[in-house]
A protein has these predicted regions:
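Non-catalytic alpha/beta scaffold blocks inside enzyme catalytic domains
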Residues: 1-165, 213-217
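Long, low-complexity segments enriched in small/aliphatic residues
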Residues: 148-217
Length: 217
């Protein structure tokens, strides 16, 4: 017993390896009963059982394994996902759109557009809304306000901007043996964890300085 969760203090949290994962989990963005998780998707794609994959800003190195399916990439900064895609739908970075985010505490936050997306890039919801028209399955919103109203109707806590909702705890985990292996961070390089930081000259300098510092030690 670690004693990190008490009535007067909650010292337990999870640092997700993807910035959008906390918000995605909040709206139930997980595989359905007959759905596949990420590992299974890559495995099925490699076996030739999946013919089509739509990457929503997915830029981790695992996407390089997608050799067989037809790949649509929606994102920005031309990162790994764009390099292997058959079709690219240029999206907007967080500075180029107004959006709702959820931080690692579970606190909903609003971001306001600071600049316009370059070229033909569009806000992500506009891309998906346009595609829904193309496949004749129109989504029930036409602007950001109606989209947010729909979001807040289904997930009211996301409308409580800058507030943290008390977590509903339940039992989790399973019993099992712990392997005798080294515990280490799942993130090897904190300077290049997303498509924006990987194209940043400043972060490249920080990374090189850190590498040189470690080498000197």
């Amino acid at each position: 017993y670690l004693g990190v969760v008490k009535k007067e203090w909650n010292g337990f949290n999870i640092l997700q390896t993807s910035a959008g994962r906390t918000g995605a989990l909040d709206i139930g963005f997980i595989p359905s009963k007959k759905g596949l998780n990420a590992k299974q998707i890559f495995s099925k794609a490699d076996e030739g059982d999946l013919s089509f994959i739509w990457l929503m800003g997915v830029d981790n190195k695992d996407v390089l394994k997608l050799k067989k399916p037809f790949v649509v990439y929606q994102g920005h900064h031309g990162d790994v996902g764009a390099h292997i895609a058959d079709v690219i739908l240029p999206g907007a970075a967080y500075t180029e759109k107004s959006a709702t985010y959820v931080n690692t505490e579970g606190r909903p936050q609003l971001a306001k557009q600071a600049t316009f997306p370059p070229g033909d890039a569009k806000e992500d919801w506009k891309i998906i809304r346009a595609f829904s028209d193309y496949v004749k399955n129109k989504l029930p919103f036409d602007d950001l306000e109606s989209l947010r109203n729909k979001l807040y109707d289904e997930f009211p806590h996301l409308g409580d901007i800058d507030e943290i909702k008390k977590a509903r705890w339940s039992k989790f985990g399973t019993k099992g043996k712990i392997d005798n292996i080294e515990l280490k961070s799942s993130i090897e390089n904190f300077y290049n964890t997303c498509s924006i930081s990987r194209t940043s000259e400043t972060m490249a300098i920080c990374l090189n300085n850190n590498i040189n510092k470690i080498a000197a030690e």
